[in-house]
Amino acid sequence: MFLINVLTVTLPILLAVAFLTLVERKALGYMQLRKGPNVVGPYGLLQPIADAIKLFTKEPIYPQTSSKFLFTVAPILALTLALTVWAPLPMPYPLINLNLSLLFILAMSSLMVYSILWSGWASNSKYALMGALRAVAQTISYEVSMTTITLSMVLMNGSFTLTAFAMTQEHLWLILPMWPLMMMWFTSTLAETNRAPFDLTEGESELVSGFNVEYSAGPFALFFMAEYANIIMMNALTVILFMGTSYDPQMPEISTINFVMKTIILTICFLWVRASYPRFRYDQLMHLLWKNFLPLTLALCMWHISVLISLACIPPQA
């Protein structure tokens, strides 16, 4: 029974990842005044399936000087972690209901760094290693601000459990009183998932393709799927934390539709940002976090603590 539950969560995610690639190509196409994919199937709808068949039927090529074991394990680990993070997300029922589900998600997203670092190191290519080191520095840096923002959210919620956020936001979405945190959180999720304008790991002009430059066929597809699964997961987490998913026990499907629609809107915002903004320089990326986001998030965290204590309205510890 548990295996069926796992499949009912995993398969829709993989399907969403496949069609997100199509939506991205279409969106970028229209923003650049062209059509995007429109040959394979009606309106290009079969393009992701054709891409999957092409990638998984090709022979993977291993560089002669690479560490073959790590080179193979890295993309598998990346996709496994990207899918594992979905387990505690309430949609409206989580696959695994953890008391510390928010901490679990932060810990799992931190582990993604290892798959990127291994892939860059195992490729034995200076471009791949440079991309991997950039990814590690970027991810670790932006996790600092994400963790501080999460702490502020937990103070408002009174619990690390994600299901409690729906009850906290029954009357008012937290995006309204905490909009500065929401803006910094959204920017941090862009950096955490290595998306434009923070895609320094894949700087085409200097690093060709970044940490996955030596990958082809199936292993490359696994990295690609992991990246897009992480994008959808981060947006789903943003919806849970800031844009309260209304939950009615009589009609849980309404809650799911509500949740999915908000996640789709945020994901389209990711694509919109990619089409609109140029890439940041590395020093600008680090300056933004350490000199702007970190002091602001710490100050807001102290503000939330002091307001709750001064008004004697600390939420119940669930």
UniProtKB/Swiss-Prot annotation:
Question: Which one GO biological process term can you cite for this protein?
Answer: mitochondrial respiratory chain complex I assembly
Respond yes or no to whether keyword Electron transport is given for this record: yes
Keywords in alphabetical order: Electron transport, Membrane, Mitochondrion, Mitochondrion inner membrane, NAD, Respiratory chain, Translocase, Transmembrane, Transmembrane helix, Transport, Ubiquinone
Entry's transmembrane regions? 2-22, 69-89, 102-122, 146-166, 171-191, 222-242, 253-273, 294-314
Entries under Pfam families matching the protein: NADHdh
**EC class:** translocase
Give compartment(s): Mitochondrion inner membrane
Q: EC number(s)? A: 7.1.1.2
Q: Name one GO molecular function term.
A: NADH dehydrogenase (ubiquinone) activity
Q: Which domain of life is it from?
A: Eukaryota
Record field: catalytic activity? a ubiquinone + NADH + 5 H(+)(in) = a ubiquinol + NAD(+) + 4 H(+)(out)
Q: Name one GO cellular component term.
A: respiratory chain complex I
Membrane topology of this protein:
Multi-pass membrane protein
What does the UniProt function comment say about this protein? Answer: Core subunit of the mitochondrial membrane respiratory chain NADH dehydrogenase (Complex I) that is believed to belong to the minimal assembly required for catalysis. Complex I functions in the transfer of electrons from NADH to the respiratory chain. The immediate electron acceptor for the enzyme is believed to be ubiquinone.
- According to its UniProt record, which protein family does this protein belong to? Belongs to the complex I subunit 1 family.
Protein name according to UniProt: NADH-ubiquinone oxidoreductase chain 1
Q: Which gene encodes it?
A: MT-ND1
